[in-house]
Design a protein with these regions (language model features):
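Amphipathic alpha-helical dimerization/coiled-coil segments
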Residues: 77-122
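Generic structural signal for hydrophobic core residues of well-folded globular domains
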Residues: 11, 98-99, 157
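Basic helix-turn-helix/winged-helix DNA-binding cores
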Residues: 1-87
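Charged, low-complexity intrinsically disordered regulatory/assembly segments
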Residues: 104, 108-111, 117-184
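A short small-residue
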Residues: 2, 95-97, 128-129
């Protein structure tokens, strides 16, 4: 799932500042790769340039707030209901994000993913396979297992209560190192 769409989806909850959006995306999607806060700010700049977000004022301590424009609302809703490819990582992050947000958009998203993962006719066998068909058979087997796992995961989703934006200030930086006592 793109960071662009994750930020738009979280902003459906209301105005937020950059570091707050960073924490919300990480918490709601349970990303399997680290998210650099600099990526968040550069993506917010592009979203503003593209007319999908606008300034929503500042916090009490002068942090800029962002909110969705009408175009941003439309793009966020489309992202939360209409996946375009059956990609495992995208599906997991997008479904977890959708489940964490209020509304019934997750039902449409899950239904679309089910259709994307339904069995389909395999890849063309016109390509010469120097392994005598073993590589093609192994690839088709992997695709069947992935489809089966995706559909099983969609069938076993827990009920997750949506939650609002966190308003507590997230701590930044590294934790203070414990004092090391010199040897005696």
């Amino acid at each position: 799932m793109t960071l662009r769409h994750s930020l738009l989806a979280v902003l459906t909850l209301g105005p937020a500042y950059g570091y707050q959006l960073h924490g919300e995306v990480v918490e709601r999607t349970r990303r399997d790769t680290p998210l650099n806060v600099g990526q968040v700010y550069s993506t917010l700049d592009r979203l503003r340039r593209d007319g999908l977000i606008a300034s929503a004022g500042i916090t009490d301590d002068n942090l800029p707030l962002y909110e969705l424009t009408d175009s941003g609302i439309i793009e966020a809703r489309m992202h939360l209901t209409e996946p375009d490819t059956p990609d495992w990582h995208d599906m997991v992050e997008r479904v977890l994000l959708a489940l964490s947000l209020p509304g019934s958009h997750h039902d449409a998203l899950i239904a679309h993913y089910r259709r994307l993962w339904e069995p389909y006719a395999g890849a063309s066998s016109e390509t010469l396979d120097p392994t005598g068909g073993q590589a093609q058979a192994a690839a088709e087997h992997a695709a069947r297992l992935l489809r089966s796992a995706a559909l099983a995961w969609l069938d076993s989703l827990p009920v997750i209560e949506p939650w609002p934006l966190r308003t507590d200030r997230r701590r930044r930086g590294r934790r203070a190192a414990e004092a090391v006592q010199p040897p005696r």
